[in-house]
Amino acid sequence: MKTTIRKLFVLGLLFSLCFSVSASEKIIKVACVGNSITFGAGIANREKNSYPAQLQYYLGEEFEVRNFGVSGTTALSSGDYPYVKTTAFKQSLDYLPDIVLIKLGTNDTKPQNWCHKNNFHNDYQALIDAYQKLASSPRVILLTPVRCFLDNCTGICPQTIEKEIHPLVETLAWENRLEIIDLFRLFGNSWNSVLMPDKLHPSAIGAGMMAQKIGDYLLQKPTEKTKEPALGNQATPFNFHGFQGMDFQINGISCKLVRPYIEAEGKPWVLRARFWGHEPQTDVALLEQGFHIAYCDVADLYGSEEAIKRWDDFYKFMKRQGFHRKVVLEGMSRGGLIVYNWAARNPKKVACIYADAPVMDLKSWPMGNGKGAGSKADTENMLKAYHFKSREEALAWKGNPLDHARTLAKAKIPILHVVGDADQVVPVQENTTPFETLMAQYNHPIKVIHKPGVDHHPHSLYNPEPIVRFVLSAFGRTQNACVKAIPGNEYRSGAGWKEGAEWHSIAEEIESCLNNRNLKLLLLGNSITQGWGGNRSLVTYRPGKAMMDKVLGENVWETAGISGDRTQNLLWRIRYGNYNRCHPENVVIAIGVNNLIHGDNGEDTAEGIIAVAQEAVRQFPDSRIFVLGLFPVGREAQNPVRIQYNKTHEILNRHKWKGVTYINPTSWFTDNQGNIQEGLYSRDYIHLTEKGYQVAAEKIKELIQSR
């Protein structure tokens, strides 16, 4: 009997182990539901370049992404092509997905459809219900429509998308407590033909941006549900762009708190000063990243003692509710007064500061003691709030945000300002500029994003991604995209390709070109590397071919460069392209400039280059590998991108390389002052001329002949 029990126990244990393994290896099925934008209309090789296809690459093997998009479809069941009447809709239900991404509403704005607008809410709700009733109990996530840049409303109407569809999707998310991802601002507020060639459908590059934003959201690791904050019986709910908000009071003071649907570890939060709901895009994006957004009213107090006391009480309340001990402070305009005055009193409680056109000196605003007009009414209110007995006392006061620079620098608080350079209300020269100068003197520079020609309004950035990245970096929560292997999505013939070629066809041609060869040299990189030309038939611009043929000989070398590639794209190609089929004696890698141009910093770019080199060591075990990092960019030594370039090479120079020889090529192309030598670069000071390729070819020859 005991033996039988023991056998049953062992069998049960084995079963449970097998079950746990299979459960842990369960593929997460993602259904992308939508219209032509989901389908990938107008995108060359849409099977690999539509947003669902690129999302699959981005999410990796733990996910299975399927495209159920149908061009022209509507959420309206009374529309001219209802999604619920398509075969794809039935297939998406039969798929029993774990996650459903719904992106509909654009075609509903056509005149023949929007005449039924009163049915939109209920018809969209019925679509949501259909997925929520599935046996797989999927996460249903609503995607707001992307912005449309069409010029009129004869068909799809941009104004209706912005003013009616977008808010309705947010309302549905709020009512159903559904996760929501804001795509509306992703492509900015002015048309970019690279991202949306026909002003309606994203290109492969635009689809890649969609995939990255959605992918970053889906790859967040949900934390265990925490106890909801105790906000009191009088708290009332409100809709904050699809998220769950609550109005409540502390000691009779109006407060607000908006909760994310997926809470980030540690319960990070933002305390916003003044102008609740104005330019909310940063707050919405941080909610998507798991941050709570909070507000405690300090209106008409101008950062005075009473304002500081209110925030002290609010901070204590949030700490008792289990929120992070360090808060993100966000202030626009006069909100800068309370942000900096509170931070100076509580530097150890501040994670970072994002200030937008902030008032840093009462003399500038509201007193108007400089170039700005100031505000007479606000000056009178400010004098009362501070209990100043006279205007002269206020002018002599030494408790302005500018006066806190030394304290804030000592605390090493990360600080970002976003300013309009033509601000006539809170002039940059009287507020941010002197503060920036002081912080630099105290060895803690701040970051300033300038908006040329912009006045005091509009605040923020239309696409807040740089602000969000700054906040995440302060918490150490940024993911380095430079080291994440994904295919590229370049598609333009201006990339130096024959018409009709796109990234995947170029990548496939490289693989074919390397078959059955034994090369002396294989060059890996981006458009600069592509410019060597080699024997690739789809490449139309090859200024370096004659130079390399001259120094090495014909047919003994090849280029595997692709225009537009960043480190993550080359990493993908090396990992999956089987480039070692050409048995190269030497491999030379030059990559990273596109990372810097697209906003990656020097540190992240360096990590990407190192990841590429490490993968090359694995894939080319019998080759000598040379890493050039990236060629210098920008004409002058003090070019902003060159400064990040230098940071990249500083890190590469310090790195302890294994199986790789690192060479900094800066001196190949620059003079004694660090400026690019005449004639070596084209007018963009990114790409080489024939003379520049001649210099590079001779230097590379020296490298591979050295022992």
Indicate residue ranges for each PLM-predicted region:
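Hydrolase active-site cap/lid region
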Residues: 81-82, 341-391
